[in-house]
Amino acid sequence: MKLHLGCGPVIVPGWVNVDKSPNVLLSRVPALKRGLARVGVLTQGHLDASFTRDVVHADVLAGLPYPDGTAEFIYHAHVIEHLSRPQAQRFLQECARLLAPGGVLRVTTPDLAQIVDAYRAGERGGPDAPMPADRFMQTLETYVDLPGARLQRFVRRNFATAYVHQWLYDADSLAQLMREAGLEPGPPLGYRQGGFPDLDQLEIREQGLFMQATRPA
């Protein structure tokens, strides 16, 4: 089995694509989804994001309904930064449980070291560009503006929390998190590098930290 966790709208054939977004369920009732968008409860971005019926709606933190050691490969991109560090540890522990001995987990996430280096370089890029500190805060993505009336903000908040970053990693801290989950981390890799299957379909963001870990045999 190959698991794609937090798949979003990136649905890859041959993988079990899993996402906990309410949009997975709303995509199964298109008329309701369009109605919520018309009254402004959902944004255009929510409306445009579509999920096929074979996407599994599940929360990894609650545990996935698969036996131990049944996954050869697990992939998740830009997921763990949306979790607190204790939650991320539980998330990777669930990945370790699901992996077969010798199975491989690949994680991509924003690279905190790259973000800090860009801030310290202090390059503004023109008089109309954001100040380095403002760009740094924007890149951290720890805040999401929620426009709209009270009901719209209430509903959007339940969608938007998934987009806020809670904890970022550099290569050393991500490797430590992997070890704490019982995995053996490898060195940082490049975009679509590392001998992992279907990266041409799974990996769509070129920037970030790319690392793999194996479950010990």
Stretch-by-stretch model annotation:
Residues 1, 36-40, 150, 192-195:
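Short amphipathic alpha-helical surface micro-motifs
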Residues 3-117, 172, 211-216:
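Conserved SAM-binding loop
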Residues 47, 87-94, 100, 104-216:
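S-adenosyl-L-methionine-dependent methyltransferase catalytic module, highlighting the catalytic core
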